[in-house]
Every structure is written in structure tokens, then in C-alpha cells.
């Protein structure tokens, strides 16, 4: 077996955490590795009514038989990492690549203090942009320089590639979404690095020939936090009428809501090299679909929407989320692949 990468197709908050958790429980990876920018993105997973919001530890932590690795491309805030390790009780499984660059208090201050970043761009204020600047200038500290992290250091590419060579399954999760990519997103209203599947693979040290599948996650009603173009954005009143009111996991800011954007989704699927698509929020599209776990039980409206998505992205929709709980999902991978 090789690796599967899961990334966001819009502007983040697509429900990747839920999809990662489901694939982890069903496919049983030996390693769940995290790529992406850093603790500027939050992933939420809900199990048995209990919500977990994580910013550093891979959201697949809910699958207890996998090692949890953070790739060298990810910025690490030691305080956030250690707090999550303690809260989630994953100290025996969580490891950080020794080359990860470190977010220091000065980076957070610079992020929050910059009028350009905080007012114009709408940064999350977590220090990622300024830390990446230091990394590019080759002055950033690395995880190996931080005494508090010494018990958690690893060579992530070595572990991931050895597992793949041994025929074991590795799950790699990204953060944020395609629309926030520094290269392909709605520049300058983007994050501080690329967020596509190729970049996520690079973050954890996996070459393209090792990747078997790329699952791109879209939500029925795309959302974005902060400033920037949003072609299909709907008025807040319209979103409220539909019962869609959401807040960001990290910032607590209200998310902007939009209608499905097939053209953007197609471009995102193309650049990410999607082999499968996951759709979340079908229960927001049609409340009668809440908690449904079989394709046959979806309403005609929901089925028509899924068929439209497949026409737009030209890739099979294999996973359909029908609610926040882990078990509220339709898995069509056996039928469609």
C-alpha cells in the first residue's frame, strides 16, 4: 500500500477532520502524518457528542493505533503542541520532525501587529506568516533547538517511507484549502505557503510515486474566514434562512457562506490531482438527509447535487458526510473505485 492525501478544495473549513477520522477508522493506517502551514488552521472532529478542536496534532488522532507525525514543512508552536499532547493524551504517539521551524512569541506579535496582515489580509494572528519569513531567511529556530520538544523528535520522511516500503498504509492530511494557496489561491488574500496535495506530500517528505490517492474535500456551501474574493458568496440573511451559521475554529470569527462553485471546484480538483472527492454538509443542503448512511436513502435533491458535483469535478464522489458525527457518512469507495 502507499499513501493517501486528504486536502481541502475551497477556502478551508470543508470538514477535512471528519473525513480523515473516517478514513483512519476504516482503512487503519500505521501512520497519520500532517502537512500544511501550522497552527493557523483548526480541525474539528466530533465523536459521541464530544467535540475536539486541534491545531497541531493530526485530526486523525481519534484512531488510536496510528503514530501521529508532523512533517518538516509544518510550523510548530511548542506551547500549542505540548498542550494538545497533554489534552489528548497522545504523548506516546505524537512526534515532530526535527527540522520543523518554530513559531516564537515575536512571530505572533508581528502577525497581530501588522496592519497589512491583520486588517487587509485577515490573518489568524498565530505567527505563521512571520515565522515562514524567518524560515526563508534561514534564521528560524528548528524543533531540534527546543529542549521541551526533545522527547518528541523524529525523522518523519524516514518513518513514512519505511512504512510504505513495508506495504503499510499511510494517511497524510493537509490543512486550510486550495483557495488559500500562496501560489494558486486568491492572492494576496491567502496563507503563507502552498496548500495543494503536492505541497502536503512535500511537507512530510513523500515523493509523488508513493501517493496512491488524493481525496479533495468540498462542502456543499463553501465558506471562508477573513477578507478576499468569494465569487458565490451569499448575504448573511440568506445563510441564516438556510440555517447555516458557522464560526472559525481558531479565530472564532463568523464564516462567510457561499453557493456551490462548480468552476472553482473543477480547477481545484485538477491542480490537486484528485482521484476521489468527499462532500460534506449534505444535511445543510437538505435536512432530510441528516444522519443518512446509505446512498439509496438520500433525497432526490441530494442525489442530484452529488451528480452535479461529479459532472463539475470529473472525479467520483466517494464519501458523503450527512452530519457532524463520525458515523454520519456514506462511504461509496467499494462501489465506485
From Swiss-Prot:
**Binding-site positions, substrate:** 249-255
Main localization category: cytoplasm
Magnesium as UniProt keyword: yes
Indicate yes or no for the key word Cell membrane.
no
Q: Which reaction does it catalyse?
A: IMP + L-aspartate + GTP = N(6)-(1,2-dicarboxyethyl)-AMP + GDP + phosphate + 2 H(+)
Localization, UniProt: Cytoplasm
Alphabetical list of Pfam families matching this protein:
Adenylsucc_synt
Instruction: Please give the pathway this protein is involved in.
Output: Purine metabolism; AMP biosynthesis via de novo pathway; AMP from IMP: step 1/2
Q: Which residues bind GTP?
A: 12-18, 42-44, 255, 281-283, 321-323
Where are the catalytic residues?
13 (proton acceptor), 43 (proton donor)
Which positions are annotated as binding IMP?
A: 13-16, 40-43, 124, 138, 176, 191, 253
- Give the UniProt keywords, A-Z: Cytoplasm, GTP-binding, Ligase, Magnesium, Metal-binding, Nucleotide-binding, Purine biosynthesis
> What does the record give as the function of this protein?
Plays an important role in the de novo pathway of purine nucleotide biosynthesis. Catalyzes the first committed step in the biosynthesis of AMP from IMP.
Per UniProt, subunit arrangement is: Homodimer.
This chain belongs to which protein, by name? Adenylosuccinate synthetase
Amino acid at each position: 500500500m502507499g499513501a493517501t492525501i486528504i486536502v481541502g478544495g475551497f477556502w478551508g473549513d470543508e470538514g477535512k477532520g471528519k473525513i480523515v477520522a473516517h478514513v483512519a477508522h476504516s482503512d487503519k493506517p500505521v501512520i497519520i502524518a500532517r502537512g500544511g502551514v501550522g497552527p493557523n488552521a483548526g480541525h474539528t472532529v466530533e465523536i459521541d457528542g464530544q467535540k475536539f478542536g486541534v491545531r497541531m496534532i493530526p485530526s486523525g488522532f481519534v484512531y488510536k493505533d496510528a503514530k501521529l507525525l508532523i512533517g518538516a514543512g509544518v510550523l510548530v508552536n511548542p506551547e500549542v503542541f505540548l498542550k494538545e499532547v497533554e489534552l489528548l493524551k497522545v504523548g506516546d504517539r505524537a512526534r515532530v520532525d526535527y527540522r520543523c521551524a518554530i513559531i516564537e512569541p515575536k512571530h505572533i506579535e508581528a502577525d497581530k501587529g501588522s496592519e497589512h496582515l491583520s486588517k487587509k489580509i485577515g490573518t489568524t494572528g498565530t505567527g505563521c506568516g512571520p515565522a515562514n519569513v524567518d524560515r526563508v531567511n534561514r534564521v528560524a529556530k528548528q524543533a531540534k533547538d527546543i529542549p521541551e520538544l526533545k522527547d518528541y523528535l523524529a525523522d518523519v520522511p524516514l518513518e513514512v517511507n519505511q512504512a510504505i516500503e513495508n506495504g503499510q498504509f499511510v494517511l497524510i492530511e493537509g490543512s486550510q484549502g486550495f483557495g488559500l494557496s500562496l501560489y494558486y489561491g486568491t492572492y494576496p488574500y491567502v496563507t503563507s505557503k502552498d496548500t495543494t496535495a503536492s505541497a502536503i506530500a512535500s511537507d512530510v517528505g513523500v515523493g509523488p510515486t508513493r501517493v496512491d490517492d488524493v481525496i479533495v474535500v468540498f462542502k456543499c456551501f463553501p465558506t471562508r474566514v477573513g477578507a478576499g474574493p468569494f465569487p458565490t458568496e451569499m448575504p448573511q440573511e440568506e445563510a441564516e434562512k438556510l440555517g447555516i451559521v458557522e464560526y472559525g475554529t481558531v479565530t472564532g470569527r463568523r464564516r462567510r457562506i457561499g453557493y456551490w462553485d462548480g468552476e472553482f471546484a473543477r480547477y481545484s480538483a485538477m491542480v490537486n490531482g484528485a482521484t476521489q472527492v468527499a462532500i460534506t454538509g449534505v444535511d445543510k443542503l437538505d435536512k432530510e438527509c441528516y444522519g443518512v448512511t446509505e446512498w439509496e436513502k438520500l433525497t432526490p435533491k441530494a442525489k442530484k447535487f452529488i451528480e452535479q458535483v461529479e459532472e463539475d469535478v470529473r472525479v467520483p464522489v466517494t464519501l458523503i458526510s450527512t452530519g457532524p458525527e463520525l458515523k454520519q457518512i456514506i462511504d461509496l469507495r467499494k462501489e465506485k473505485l
